[in-house]
């Protein structure tokens, strides 16, 4: 069995057709959900971004003892467990805190791809393409494919095309959607 875990930060299930919303149209996500394991009663243990990632990685309720900190060295991660039984483990993310400040959230992944998206300066040539808009890098995003989440999913898809015949655990974590 292969596992693809897609993190949708701050994305409310009640806004998806797959979970009963009749007004908002989400056909692509609904189609994915129809072929996937869905959790009807999943509750987060930690609210902030990285403590939630620690919960994902370790299966533990981490907010009460570690907060927004690096993963502890001695803490076993899901990626380590799956790698230990022969899975190729990979993560693709644009969430900026995985590697910042020795956060150690790449622990156990044999392949780890960090799209600089949310944490890097936009390419200089794009910043100056649109006059007077360089103060907000999002102003340079003219096409959907310029945005961080699509670029993260393209990278994940490329990895999947190369490794689909293997036993794998692919963890995909785009930062979007985020702030309210």
Where are these regions (language model features)?
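Catalytic domains that recognize anionic headgroups
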Residues: 1-180
């Amino acid at each position: 069995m292969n596992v693809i875990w897609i993190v949708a930060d701050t994305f409310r299930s009640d806004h998806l057709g797959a979970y009963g919303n009749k007004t908002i149209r989400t056909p692509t996500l609904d189609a994915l959900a129809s072929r996937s394991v869905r959790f009807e009663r999943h509750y987060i243990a930690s609210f902030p971004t990285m403590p939630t990632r620690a919960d994902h990685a370790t299966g533990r309720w981490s907010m009460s003892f570690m907060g927004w900190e690096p993963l502890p060295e001695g803490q076993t991660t899901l990626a380590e467990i799956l790698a230990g039984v022969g899975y190729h483990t990979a993560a693709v993310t644009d969430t900026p805190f995985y590697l910042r400040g020795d956060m150690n959230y790449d622990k156990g992944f044999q392949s780890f791809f960090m799209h600089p998206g949310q944490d890097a300066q936009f390419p200089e040539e794009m910043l100056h393409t649109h006059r007077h808009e360089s103060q907000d890098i999002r102003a340079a995003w003219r096409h959907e494919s310029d945005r961080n989440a699509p670029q993260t999913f393209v990278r994940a898809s490329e990895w999947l095309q190369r490794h689909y015949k293997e036993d794998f655990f692919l963890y995909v974590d785009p930062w979007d959607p985020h702030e309210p």
